[in-house]
Each structure stands twice: as C-alpha cells, then as structure tokens.
A protein has these predicted regions:
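Alpha-helical scaffold segments that flank or form the walls of functional sites
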Residues: 77-141, 167-182
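His/Asp/Glu-enriched, well-ordered alpha-helical/loop segment
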Residues: 245-252, 293-382, 397-399
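Conserved small/polar residues in nucleotide/adenosyl-binding loops
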Residues: 415-422
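C-terminal cap of metal-dependent C-N hydrolases
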Residues: 11, 372-414
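Histidine-rich, glycine-flanked metal-binding segment
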Residues: 1-6, 13-59
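Active-site gating loops and adjacent loop-to-helix segments of metal-dependent hydrolytic enzymes
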Residues: 73-104, 147-165, 225-250, 275, ...
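Metal-coordinating catalytic core of metallo-dependent amide/deamination hydrolases
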Residues: 132-259
C-alpha cells in the first residue's frame, strides 16, 4: 500500500512534450511528484488529501520570469502616460515605500499569482526586499528575489540611491538571512537594474559576488532605445556586448524585455546560455516588438513575465495570448507564416522556460515523476474550453487565470477555487 500526501484522481495531464494524456492519476509525496499512472495503479493507495480530477487538466505551475512585487500598489497609474514611465513614476514610487508597504505589496502579488496559476516568480527588486521575502515565505510560493541595485543616474532618488558598495552589502545581507528560506523555496539573486544606472564598478562587483555565492543575476536588458544609445555613446558597445566584456553574460544571467536586440546580440546571448524573458504587454505598450522567433531559433531559453501589476495584472495566460498574436501579426503575416509562434511553444515558455530562467529547470517546469510538485489544476469542463479538437491550442487561446481550480506548490495545496454555488452564496 502506497501512502501519498495528495492524490489527484481521474485527471488529464499536460506532458512535458506538450501532449495531453488520457485519464490518469497523480500521486504527490514529500513535495515531489511520486507517481503518474492509471487508476488501477492507485487502487490500494491512500492519501491525506484526495482531489477529484474529473474535468480538470493537471499542468505545471506557470512561472513569472520577471516581475516587480513592490509595484502592486501602483496598479492602474501608469497606463496612458508619456515616457519615461520608470523615471517619472516607478522609481519615485518605489523610493518612498516603507517596509510595511513592501510587505503588503508582496502579499497582494503572491495572492494574485497563486490564484492565476503562477507558482514561482523572479523579482528583479525594489526596496525593503526582506519584507517581500517574508511575504513569499508566508504565502508558500517559490521565488528568486533580488534587490534593485543602482549607483548612478539622475533618476535615482531616496531609498534607492546607494553607492556600489552599499548596494552589494545590502544584497549580501539579504542573501545571508534568506537564501534557502521557506524550505528551500526562496533564492536570493543579485541585480543590475539596467546598464544606464549601474557603474562599471557595481557591475563588476555583482558578477564577482554572484559567482562567489553560486547564485543568479537579474537584469533589464535592451528594454528601450535610450539604453542602447547610452551604451553606444559611453562604451562604444551595445548593452549585450558591454555586459559580455564585463564577464556578466552566462547561464546564471536572466535578462528581462530583450526588445532592442541585434542579430549579433541574439547569437552572443544564446551562445553564452543567457536566460531571456519576454514581457509581452509591457514591451508592446512601451518598447516594441521583440525578435522572439529569432531568439528561439538561435536555441536560447525563453520565458515569460508580467513585469508587475502597475500597468495590468499578473496573469501569464494573458501574456501568452499577447505574445502569440503580436508575433503572428509582426513576423508571421508579412511572410505568410502562421506557425511563427505556436501554442505548444508558448506553453513551454510559460513553464519550462521560466523554470530554466530561475535556475530550477531540473526540478520544475513540467509534470513528471521525480520533479517538484508545483502544479495547477485547470477547469477544462467549461463552455469556453470544451469541446475542443486541440486542448493545448485552446488553453493558450481561451483559458485564463480564472480557470485555475487548484494551486499546489512544493507539495502543498495552497489554493482551491470556490465552486460557482459557493461564490453565489458568499
């Protein structure tokens, strides 16, 4: 007789190859996916908690590869504003946050992500990130957390204005106190806010410290043309080339946005094993169309991010749709290529690509025996999803965070959506 912590019965599973299984059951034990098999294989099994999987799809938890949890309280403020939004709104706002503000903002972000099927995220940092880490630990989520580091530029104000040494010391302290916290769910990374606000000294120190502590680096890169222009004028190199010269490009680097990349940039970053994150809605609203198909063709690992709640929401399902149709319109239609950005590719970005980006591709990103039980159950027995002749296509085109019924992180059931009757009664 096999004992499980959670047993999901009579469900369908999204396999790592993006095909959907026939009806099966999933056994979870000690934070891991222990067994996936037919109902007959679980006939003698017992579980602490049993979930009815009928009409549900078990899929990997989505991973938000680039967000700003400290901007949760800024929702709705930056839409329809003239550039530069980050200097006029984001940095001044973050600079004035109190520790309790960052904590509450972190709590709200975690709650929204869990409800929308996101089980892990990478935060490129703000202020008082120790309080964000507290919120993550309490929520049960998984996260790679960095502290925003900047030491130059007229846009830096208040609590975000530091010397290079101060910025590094603060991240080291965060690492000392929180690395591996929450049963291993929290990782502490270093950050390069962007090349326009980080000196050579700071970038060098970030690279050295990340290497010494065997951790990651989170950077905004090639987000907008001003950044590229700055680099060309100051360093006579494009941003990716400059960071490569500084020894930063490598497998432990996560770059967000990646809009203004040249073909040489793409080849260089793919060769170095850089993990790239696209933020479709943020990119289209402020920066332009990324070369996502070309980046994938170069063999780079690509994930998706929401870039925080300030302009919209924290729903990776929405990001998949926006990237799909923007790439079809911009790259597909001119060459009559309807498969320039396929639905299975987008689902892989939202799961496996994100797992690679946060350094856990070996244990996260797919529903497979021996991987961590970071799973979501999607209600597919609904009129906007069923019937369908291709469930994977329909998930990308029609599903959203409201279709998430259950969220399991690290083997713990953190969220169960109330039934329609329960919602009406409440």
């Amino acid at each position: 007789m096999e004992n499980y912590d959670i047993l999901i019965k009579n469900c369908q599973v999204l396999n790592p190859d993006m095909n959907v299984s026939s009806t099966c059951s999933v056994g979870i034990k000690d934070t891991w996916i222990k067994k996936i098999g037919s109902a007959d294989e679980f006939v003698d099994s017992v579980a602490t908690e049993t979930l009815d999987g009928k009409g549900k799809l078990v899929m990997p938890g989505l991973i938000d590869g680039h967000t700003h949890t400290c901007q949760q309280l800024l929702r709705g403020r930056v839409a329809d504003e003239y550039p530069m939004v980050w200097t006029r709104f984001l940095v001044p706002f973050e600079s004035n946050l109190l520790p309790e503000d960052s904590y509450v903002s972190g709590q709200l972000a975690c709650l929204e992500m869990i409800k929308n099927g996101t089980t892990a995220f990478a935060d490129s940092g703000g202020v008082h990130m120790e309080r964000v880490a507290d919120a993550v630990i309490e929520s049960g989520m998984r996260a790679a957390i960095a502290k925003s580091t900047m030491d130059m530029g007229n846009a830096i104000t208040g609590a975000m204005k530091e010397t290079a040494s101060e910025a590094i010391d603060h991240t080291k302290e965060l690492y000392k106190n929180y690395q591996g916290a929450g049963d291993g769910r929290v990782d502490i990374w270093f950050a390069i806010r962007q090349v326009m606000t980080c000196s050579r000294d700071l970038i060098t120190m970030v690279g050295e410290c990340a290497k010494e502590l065997h951790t990651g680096i989170h950077a905004h890169l090639c987000e907008h043309k001003d950044e590229v222009s700055f680099c060309l004028q100051k360093y006579r190199k494009r941003p990716a080339e400059f960071l490569d010269e500084m020894g930063i490009l490598g497998p432990n680097l996560l770059t967000a946005h990646n809009v203004m990349l040249s073909d040489h940039d793409i080849a260089l970053m793919a060769e170095r094993g850089v993990k790239m994150i696209h933020c479709p809605r943020a990119n289209l609203a402020n920066h332009g169309f990324p070369k996502a198909p070309q980046i994938l063709e170069a063999g780079a690992s690509v994930g998706l991010g929401c870039d925080g709640a300030a302009p919209s929401n924290l729903d990776i399902f929405d990001e998949m749709k926006v990237l799909r149709y923007s790439m079809l319109a911009y790259w597909g239609l001119p060459s009559f290529n309807p498969v320039v950005m396929t639905c299975p590719t987008l689902l892989k970005m939202a799961s496996q690509g994100g797992a690679n980006a946060i350094g856990h591709g070996d244990i996260l990103g797919s529903v497979k025996e021996g991987k961590k039980a970071d799973l979501i159950l999607l209600n597919i027995d609904q009129p906007h999803i069923t019937p369908t002749q291709n469930l994977v296509n329909t998930i990308v085109d029609a599903a959203n965070g409201h279709d998430v019924i259950d969220s399991i992180i690290n083997g713990c059931l953190l969220y169960t959506s109330p039934s329609p009757r329960d919602r009406s009664l409440s």
